[in-house]
């Protein structure tokens, strides 16, 4: 049985590329914002890993990370953050707040796959 990954990113192209590439080895659910992701999770869906962009409308990825880590039902789900920002300060802050990893966009699909495998396989 394939492990489940929830991908949250407001850019449909990122969702499509990652879903196609990761879909060979994982069951990927793509949602375009954290609000929809929270609704999906509250329906009883439990992914093995979440990949979330940081800069999104409605709710930012860092807010989503804090929400997830404060929630007893979801805090054990590993979260990998995606961002085009190369800020070391932001990266350190997110890792301290519970992110499992931080990957810069544009990302190499093979690198993403290797990092995911290290976390959930």
PLM segments and residue spans:
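Acidic, metal-coordinating helix/loop segments flanking the phosphotransfer/catalytic sites
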Residues: 32-49
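C-terminal output helix
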Residues: 107-116
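Short, conserved "switch-loop" micro-motifs in signal-transduction and mechanochemical regulators
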Residues: 85-86
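Receiver (REC) domain active-site loop signature in two-component systems and cognate sites
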Residues: 56
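Two-component/phosphorelay signaling modules centered on CheY-like receiver
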Residues: 12-30
């Amino acid at each position: 049985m394939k492990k489940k990954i929830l991908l949250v990113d407001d850019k449909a192209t990122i969702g499509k590329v990652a879903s196609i590439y990761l879909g060979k080895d994982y069951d990927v659910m793509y949602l375009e914002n954290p609000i929809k992701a929270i609704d999906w999770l509250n329906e009883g869906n439990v992914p093995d890993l979440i990949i979330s962009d940081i800069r999104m409308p409605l709710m930012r990825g860092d807010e989503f990370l804090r929400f997830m880590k404060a929630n007893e039902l979801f805090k054990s789900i590993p979260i990998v953050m995606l961002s085009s920002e190369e800020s070391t300060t932001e990266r350190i802050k997110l890792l301290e707040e519970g992110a499992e990893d931080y990957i810069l966009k544009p990302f190499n699909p093979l690198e993403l796959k290797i990092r995911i495998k290290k976390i959930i396989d």
